[in-house]
Every structure is written in C-alpha cells, then in structure tokens.
A protein has these predicted regions:
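Cell-envelope/extracellular polymer assembly enzymes that use nucleotide-activated donors
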Residues: 2-7, 37
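Conserved donor NDP-sugar-binding/catalytic core segment of glycosyltransferases
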Residues: 99-125
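Short beta-strand-to-loop acidic/aromatic patch adjacent to the donor-nucleotide binding site
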Residues: 84-94
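Glycine-rich, basic loop-to-helix element that forms the pyrophosphate-binding segment
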Residues: 65-81
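Short, well-formed alpha-helical segments that are part of the catalytic scaffolds
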Residues: 13-30
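Acidic donor-binding segment of Leloir-type glycosyltransferases
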Residues: 25-64
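Short alpha-helix within the catalytic core of nucleotide-sugar-dependent glycosyltransferases
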Residues: 21, 25-26, 75, 83, ...
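Active-site acidic short loop of glycosyltransferases
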Residues: 35, 58, 81-84, 101
Length: 125
C-alpha cells in the first residue's frame, strides 16, 4: 500500500492538455516524498494524455474513461486509489514546492484528521 494516491481525472483541454499534464507529472517527479501512486482516469477523446503518462516512471494506474460525465471520471480515479492519503489533482494543477507531499503528510498526521486541503499559502493551524 502506498502512503499517497494522486488521483487525476483528465479530460480534453485542447492543445494545452498534454503540456499541463507534463507539468503536473514533472512536479510529482520532483517531490522529496516518493511513496505514492498516480491514478489517471482519462476522459479525453484522443491518446495524448496516455502518451504523456508513458514518459514517466511512476507506479501508474491508467483508466480510459469512455463516458461523458465529469463527476464519474473523478469517481473512477478515486475508486482506484490504494493509498492511505488521497490527493486529488486536476491535470492543470502542479505542486509549487518539492516538499509538498511531505508537508501534507506531516500536517495530516499531526492533526489526526480524516480530511485535509492544501494550498500554496502557509496557514496557522
């Protein structure tokens, strides 16, 4: 079992879609905390997102979602997650800090919470 599951519901985003997905996966590759899997549920009509994912050496679960209901796409990604902590991210999201997952895990465990949200802002807890 992984500590984190990164759940990514992907869909058509035009010519920017593959670029944004690459930027997201690059930000995951730079993380100091590496005990995670990546779960992509891809609702796009072409193979661009799948081809981007092939360039990375993560533990991947890739699902090609043939439907047209965005909330189902998100649920498919979430339902395939095996990690203790699930971090949903969209294909145009990135981690700004290389220690983001490490920080999320630390705060999550310190607070003993069941839900946590993250931001690029430092909040007092």
């Amino acid at each position: 079992m992984f500590e984190f599951s990164i759940a990514i519901p992907a869909h058509d985003r035009g010519e920017n879609g593959p670029k944004w997905m690459s930027e997201l996966l690059d930000s995951l590759e730079r993380q100091t905390f590496q005990d995670f899997e990546v779960v992509v549920s891809d609702q796009s009509k072409n193979d661009d997102i799948m081809n981007v994912c092939k360039d990375y050496d993560f533990q991947f679960t890739y699902i090609k979602y043939q439907g047209d209901v965005p909330c189902e796409n998100i649920n498919i990604a979430l339902n395939h997650c095996e990690g203790r902590i699930i971090k949903p991210m969209f294909s145009d999201d990135i981690f700004l800090k290389d220690y983001a997952l490490e920080r999320i895990q630390k705060e999550y465990d310190k607070l003993g919470c069941k839900w946590a949200f993250s931001s690029d802002r430092d909040w007092e807890t």
